[in-house]
């Protein structure tokens, strides 16, 4: 079967395979598309935490993006872990050259175990220069709080933060509501003309490592295959929920989810 689309993933490597580039590639491949990568950092981690982070030289990140895209033009780009301002600058420069229209930004800032994955200067550049280049921004609540400099304690706070991100130049926003203490998980989708709350069951499991990476990659894949942005978000959320429910229970900490749930893959393409 020929891949449905070509996706360039710009993100960090997770040695445990649950998040980062590894989760991104599993997601893209399971949904029938072709994944390419530009690695921004190499992390040594497992389900219990992050041991170390080794950054990739910004020039090499730039080279990965440009050299890959010159040969195989991506239909869409997913951006994940960007740990420094120099890395973000190199990515912005490369995006201005390759001119891909569909860009999903998952502003990864903190690992599931609590380790910080980005410095303060990088946050400012991401906020001021990268958000406006993205088709969709997909922060969780802690990330949305950092980006908007507001405290989020309720659904109403999430909606307010989403509007703040639009004011910062975001075209579309999906704030993930998993960190709120509520019976259901409510994810807020917003742009200048549309609004939607996606409601999902809350799953009683600690095995949720890589859910954010997986969601943004799934949305990128659906968007690259021609789905409208709101529908791509809906399908991505369904894919992640199915992957959580069928998680393989690996590791002693926050275990990975299951990217190979073929039943859900068949459902979302109906």
Go through each PLM region and give its residues.
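N-terminal basic/disordered segments at the start of proteins
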Residues: 17-33
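Short, small-residue alpha-helix embedded
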Residues: 22-27, 146, 205-229
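Phosphate-handling active-site elements
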Residues: 31-36, 196, 222-236
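Conserved N-terminal subdomain of the carbohydrate kinase-like
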Residues: 2-9, 29-112, 116, 263-266
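Conserved phosphate/ATP/ADP-binding segment of small-molecule kinases
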Residues: 120-195
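Short pre-catalytic strand/loop immediately N-terminal to key active-site residues, enriched for Gly-Thr
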Residues: 10-16, 195-209
